[in-house]
């Protein structure tokens, strides 16, 4: 949808799919419609960057992979600017031709990324809205104007853009547009993402009522694994709510369903303290290896870390601390002295102490923390987090220290 103009289409630069919905709904699978939108794409050579504020890329990198060092891609800056009253007046003048407000689109869109026209209607008191100009890639002139998602007529979009000082001469590759699409009721799926109605048919991604790349990718991983297991007759693979955000997402979809495009947030996970970036390897590596989707070197890398963590935790749990010997050192570190002897693990649990500074005053701990030089900090941090959360790498103790996967807040 661009204004009153409607064109059939599939994924970006692909044709529409016809009759697919009809071919499976006749078996009892239910369907409904949702919408999404996208902003205008701008030629960066036509942008006056001197009238924008630069937002540089991150310098503190946290990589997805735990395996060694990886090349850091060149960081390209984003740029910010704002709409103004003239922009708003132009957009408001075209609301009669907006598919969102002339009855052309009836389906539900995503709550958390509204179109620019929706912002104007919903927040009429706002004099400006922030816009973020983002590069589409390192070797292209195409830029994405985040915050300006729209399905207004192209001439209205362009006229409004030209009232923004930095975009006064902007040239566009394509206008913003809205899309309506079919989705299928995810409560008709098992946790494996196999249909309850048609055996061997798996659903993943936007067709399940989700929005977002990561949401689709996570479902695709689970559906793909289970499709392969289905072909070999093996037991299905399912993730629980306390094991991964993918598990939370799939459980929400299959038990609660959706009435708007679903996006994954940490707030949806009642066990989010267990679902951290720094413990993804402990939660998922062994499962992935058993499924054959993690290579041996990744498994060995994790087992080395796991054994080192267990060694440190075991040492802390059994190493006795005498108050007379440790108190002067604790006072020097600015922490409360002990009233009685304890185990080292009780000191580790103090939030303002860490293994690094404790190892400087307890030589035996320093020896126990011996690990690959490039992984000492990673292993020590994980050991501390594991200790403080009451979790242990021992499966029996681990299962006793966390709540049932099916519990609900």
Which stretches of residues belong to each language-model region?
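Extended, charge-enriched "interface" segments that sit outside catalytic cores
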Residues: 268, 285-409
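Residues forming the flavin
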Residues: 1-290, 294-295, 299-300, 304, ...
């Amino acid at each position: 949808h661009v204004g009153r103009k409607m064109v059939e289409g599939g994924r970006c630069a692909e044709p529409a799919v016809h009759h697919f919905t009809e071919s499976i709904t006749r078996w009892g699978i239910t369907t409904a419609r949702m919408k999404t939108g996208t902003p205008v794409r701008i030629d960066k050579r036509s942008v006056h960057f001197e009238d924008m504020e630069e937002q540089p890329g991150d310098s503190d990198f946290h990589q997805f992979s735990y395996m060694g060092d990886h090349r850091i891609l060149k960081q390209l800056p984003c740029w910010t600017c704002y709409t103004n009253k003239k922009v708003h007046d132009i957009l408001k003048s075209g609301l009669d031709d907006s598919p969102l407000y002339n009855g052309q689109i009836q389906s539900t869109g995503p709550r958390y990324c509204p179109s620019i026209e929706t912002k104007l209607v919903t927040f009429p008191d706002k004099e400006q809205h922030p816009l973020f100009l983002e590069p589409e890639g390192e070797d292209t002139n195409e830029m994405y104007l985040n915050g300006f998602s729209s399905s207004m007529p192209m001439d209205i979009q362009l006229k409004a853009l030209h009232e923004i000082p930095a975009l006064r001469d902007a040239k566009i590759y394509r206008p913003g547009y809205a899309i309506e699409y079919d989705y299928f009721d995810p409560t008709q799926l098992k946790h494996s993402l196999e249909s309850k109605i048609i055996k061997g048919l798996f659903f993943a991604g936007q067709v399940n009522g989700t929005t977002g790349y990561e949401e689709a990718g996570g479902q695709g991983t689970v559906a793909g694994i289970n499709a392969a297991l289905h072909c070999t007759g093996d037991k299905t693979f399912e993730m629980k709510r306390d094991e991964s955000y993918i598990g939370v997402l799939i459980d929400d979809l299959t038990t609660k369903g959706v009435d708007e495009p679903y996006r994954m947030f940490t707030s949806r996970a009642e066990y989010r303290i267990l679902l951290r970036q720094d413990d993804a390897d402990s939660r998922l590596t062994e499962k992935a290896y058993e499924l054959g989707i993690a290579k041996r070197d990744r498994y060995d890398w994790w087992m080395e870390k796991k054994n080192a963590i267990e060694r440190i935790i075991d040492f802390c749990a059994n190493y006795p601390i005498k108050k007379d010997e440790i108190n002067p050192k604790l006072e020097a570190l600015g922490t409360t002295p002990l009233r009685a002897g304890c185990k080292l693990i009780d000191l580790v649990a103090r939030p303002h102490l860490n293994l690094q500074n404790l190892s400087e005053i307890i030589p035996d701990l320093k020896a126990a923390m011996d690990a690959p030089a490039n992984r000492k900090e990673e292993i020590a941090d994980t050991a501390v987090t594991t200790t403080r959360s009451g979790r242990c790498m021992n499966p029996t103790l681990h299962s006793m220290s966390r709540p049932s996967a099916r519990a609900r807040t």
